Amino acid sequence: MKQQNDTQILQFLLLGLSENTELQPLIYWLFFSMYLVTVWGNLIIILATVLDFRLHTAMYFFLCNLSFVDICLISTTIPKMLANVHLNHKAITYEGCIMQIYFFTLFVGLDNFLLAVMAYDRFVAICHPLRYTSIMTPHLCMSLVLVSWIASVLNSSLQSFLVLQLSFCTEVEIPHFFCELSMLVHLACSDTFLSDMAMNVLAALLGGGCLVGILYSYSKIVSSIQAISSAEGKYKAFSTCVSHLSVVSLFYCTLLGVYLSSAVTQNSHSTAATSLMYTVVTPMLNPFIYSLRNDNIKRALKNFVKKKLEK
């Protein structure tokens, strides 16, 4: 491992999910397939939303943004991992590692904010259906997404800046398939108090704040559904939330799993394996969760395919 001025490291080693050479071809093709499915699945959601004017509503606008962010999230980590596995090369440059941290933190934060915004959208749709169009105006929708971007950029910029202040004095091997913020901070040989404090405080404020907002929205939604007299009305109201609730549960449960796993051990492949759920699996499943349970998305896709076949 090369060093510069004995303090600034030039590169890190990403140990990946397994050091077993026999498993590398399987890992490569598995993740290559998952990457393609994720990108194409989310692109189809975006395409269906853009081409069908009936989907030009607040809910699908947020879903379109979520699909775009999921493509960016998985593209931040998986292409580099695939390149390393293919070339049998574990190194990532210092600059590349910082860039991964910045963009990964940015897009995970955006996922977090967008899920909260979508919960608010469902709250307005079910609790205030007659005022939905007057509340969820295009201006408000754009503002909510813009605020989400600004908050995420500020968060990732601060986290990356604090990492830049750290020194790495020895060979740094990261037991992960990408540069994960908390792992990198704990591998530093300089004082990590500010970085640790920023990670914990911002996770509590941003992540916890969004989760509280989601839980509050759904508490109101449940109360409103219970007030509906007919069973059919209750089912119809609840069915509009099932897809979003499934994605929220998957996202936050896997994040909790990563937190609990890292609390037990820092330098372990188990944490990397657990983080696969929200870094790869969740973005891959989101399009299927929304499209399989959403008649509007399925209709838009059928119409798109039909038009293509008729040409």
From Swiss-Prot:
Glycan attachment positions: 5, 155
Role, per record: Possible taste receptor.
InterPro entries listed in its UniProt record: GPCR_Rhodpsn (IPR000276), GPCR_Rhodpsn_7TM (IPR017452), Olfact_rcpt (IPR000725)
Side of membrane Extracellular, spans: 1-25, 79-97, 155-196, 266-271
Disulfide pairings: 97-179
Topological type in the membrane: Multi-pass membrane protein
Organism: Rattus norvegicus
Cytoplasmic compartment residues: 47-57, 119-133, 218-244, 293-311
Record PROSITE patterns: G_PROTEIN_RECEP_F1_1, G_PROTEIN_RECEP_F1_2
GO molecular function, one term: G protein-coupled receptor activity
GO biological process, one term: signal transduction
The family this protein is said to belong to: Belongs to the G-protein coupled receptor 1 family.
Cellular-component GO terms for this entry: plasma membrane
Main location: membrane
Cross-referenced Gene3D superfamilies: Rhodopsin 7-helix transmembrane proteins (1.20.1070.10)
Compartments (UniProt record): Cell membrane
Entry protein name: Olfactory receptor 1073
PANTHER family for this protein: OLFACTORY RECEPTOR
One Pfam family matching this protein: 7tm_4
Top-level taxon in the UniProt lineage: Eukaryota
Keywords: Cell membrane, Disulfide bond, G-protein coupled receptor, Glycoprotein, Membrane, Olfaction, Receptor, Sensory transduction, Transducer, Transmembrane, Transmembrane helix
